UniProtKB/Swiss-Prot annotation:
This is Cytochrome c oxidase assembly factor 8. It is a peripheral membrane protein. N-terminal mitochondrial targeting sequence is cleaved from the mature protein once in the mitochondrion. In normal conditions, the cytoplasmic precursor protein is rapidly degraded by the ubiquitination-proteasome system (UPS). Oxidative stress induces protein stabilization and import into mitochondria where it protects COX from degradation. Expressed in fibroblasts. Belongs to the COA8 family. Required for cytochrome c complex (COX) IV assembly and function Protects COX assembly from oxidation-induced degradation, COX being the terminal component of the mitochondrial respiratory chain. InterPro entries: COA8. Keywords: Apoptosis, Disease variant, Membrane, Mitochondrion, Mitochondrion inner membrane, Primary mitochondrial disease, Transit peptide, Ubl conjugation. GO terms for cellular component: matrix side of mitochondrial inner membrane; mitochondrion. It is linked to Mitochondrial complex IV deficiency, nuclear type 17: An autosomal recessive mitochondrial disorder with highly variable clinical manifestations and severity. Clinical features vary from acute neurometabolic decompensation in late infancy to subtle neurological signs presenting in adolescence. Encephalopathic episodes are characterized by acute loss of developmental milestones including ability to walk or sit, loss of speech, episodes with somnolence and seizure, and pyramidal signs rapidly evolving into spastic tetraparesis. Its main location: mitochondrion.
C-alpha cells in the first residue's frame, strides 16, 4: 500500500450511521464505528490548522450522542473520529473507547510521517532525474516539470522496497490492535446483553 492509499473517500458529505442498518464504511471507519457514527463535512480552514503530530480536534454538536467522523487530516489523509462518551459509560466501555483513541493516534502518527517522507523523497527523485536530463524544475511555459509514468514507476518500486519492513511491522501491529478492539467490542456487547437480561428479570420480579 502506498502512503496516499490512506486517503478517505466521500469528502464533504454527512452520513448518519446507526446500529442495525447495513451501511458501507471504509476500513478505518469500520474499525472505529460503534453504536452510532456521523460524518462531519470537510472544513478547509480546520485542515490547514491541523498539527502533523496529532489527530484533528474538530468539535461535534454538544447534544450529539454518536461518534463523529471528521474531515480528512491534512497530513495523514485519515478522517479522525471523535468518540462519544455516554454518562453511564461502564469501565469495560471506557477501556474499549480509550483503546480506539490510542489506536487512532498511533495510526495518525504513522501515516502523517509516512506521507511526509513519501512527498519529500518523491520531489527529490523528480529533481534528480530532471537534473540528469539537463532540465529545469519549470517548463518553457512556466509549468512545473514532471516525469512520465514509467520513470515514476522506478521511484514507487524503490520506495516500497525500502519501506517494506516498516510496512510489514505496521500491518502486524494494525492487525493486533484491531483484534484487541474486536475482542473488547464482543465483551462490551455481552455486557450490554447481560444488563438487559437483569433489567427484565427485575421488572418481572416487581
Amino acid at each position: 500500500m502506498l502512503p496516499c492509499a490512506a486517503g478517505a473517500r466521500g469528502r464533504g458529505a454527512m452520513v448518519v450511521l446507526r446500529a442495525g442498518k447495513k451501511t458501507f464504511l471504509p476500513p478505518l471507519c469500520r474499525a472505529f464505528a460503534c453504536r452510532g457514527c456521523q460524518l462531519a463535512p470537510e472544513r478547509g480552514a480546520e485542515r490547514r490548522d491541523t498539527a502533523p503530530s496529532g489527530v484533528s480536534r474538530f468539535c461535534p454538536p454538544r447534544k450529539s450522542c454518536h461518534d463523529w467522523i471528521g474531515p480528512p487530516d491534512k497530513y495523514s489523509n485519515l478522517r479522525p473520529v471523535h468518540f462519544y462518551i455516554p454518562e453511564n459509560e461502564s469501565p469495560l466501555e471506557q477501556k474499549l473507547r480509550k483503546l480506539r483513541q490510542e489506536t487512532q493516534e498511533w495510526n495518525q502518527q504513522f501515516w502523517a510521517n509516512q506521507n511526509l517522507t513519501f512527498s519529500k523523497e518523491k520531489e527529490e527523485f523528480i529533481h534528480s532525474r530532471l537534473k540528469t536530463k539537463g532540465l529545469g524544475l519549470r517548463t518553457e511555459s512556466g509549468q512545473k516539470a514532471t516525469l512520465n509514468a514509467e520513470e515514476m514507476a522506478d521511484f514507487y518500486k524503490e520506495f516500497l522496497s525500502k519501506n517494506f519492513q516498516k510496512h510489514m511491522y505496521y500491518n502486524r501491529d494494525w492487525y493486533k490492535r484491531n483484534f484487541a478492539i474486536t475482542f473488547f467490542m464482543g465483551k462490551v456487547a455481552l455486557e450490554r446483553i447481560w444488563n438487559k437480561l437483569k433489567q427484565k428479570q427485575k421488572k418481572r420480579s416487581n
